[in-house]
Amino acid sequence: MTIPLLQYAPSSQNTRVAGYTVGGDEQPFVFTTDNVISDSDFDVLINAAYRQIFFHAFKCDRQQLLESQLRNGQITVRDFIRGLLLSETFIDSFYNKNSNYRFVEQCIQRVLGRDPFSEQEKIAWSIVICTKGLAAFVDQLLNTDEYMENFGYDTVPYQRRRSLASREQGEIPFNIKSPRYDAYYRSQLGFPQVVWQNAVRRFRTPDRVPQAGDPALFLNMARSAQIPKVNVRVSAADISLAAVPYRN
């Protein structure tokens, strides 16, 4: 008997607050098949899906079968997103390199377009992965009312309400906020690394090397000179009050 999804309380986030937004460069562009009228539009939509799920997809990471089915109308955008989440690239890059809690966090960010409400939500979805498996977790996440109301079958997920008109600065994009590898796996790979480990040395051509009598040689000697510091203390009893200026 599988455990049902545990209940968790939502928190106040921008995605849950209805508001009037003004279109601009900071607002996310919605990619949907409703606006596709040519093959180039399909290319843009597919690349947007790769950026949302993989952040960056190499040529070897592309799912050509899923792309062909999407172009021919055999599957919806929602099915295409499901295929990317269950692909070998996503499993190897995210599922195998993170704990269940962190993997749930990254899936919620990429699929639902928001941050997890709390640790209770991470625990609830992690139990689904442990009891039902990865495929059941992806299906249950895509079948939520939240996903269907915001993206439906034909829209590529995006980070919702990242920028608000009342705030000078928007939220950090998910691909920057949540690195692909967990801290443990980054340490196993040796990150972060110091790229330059040698001392920086100054090179001078022979014609610019200081010769005897050059003032530059005396400059180093002057810098190395130790000048004693003398702290002069003045007692208030030695000050003549008649010398203090005053107003008439």
UniProtKB/Swiss-Prot annotation:
Keywords: Antenna complex, Membrane, Photosynthesis, Phycobilisome, Thylakoid. It is found in: Cellular thylakoid membrane. Its main location: membrane. InterPro entries: PBS_linker_dom (IPR001297), PBS_linker_sf (IPR038255), Phycobilisome (IPR016470). Gene3D superfamilies: Phycobilisome linker domain. The phycobilisome is a hemidiscoidal structure that is composed of two distinct substructures: a core complex and a number of rods radiating from the core. Rod-core linker protein required for attachment of phycocyanin to allophycocyanin in cores of phycobilisomes. Linker polypeptides determine the state of aggregation and the location of the disk-shaped phycobiliprotein units within the phycobilisome and modulate their spectroscopic properties in order to mediate a directed and optimal energy transfer. This is Phycobilisome rod-core linker polypeptide CpcG.
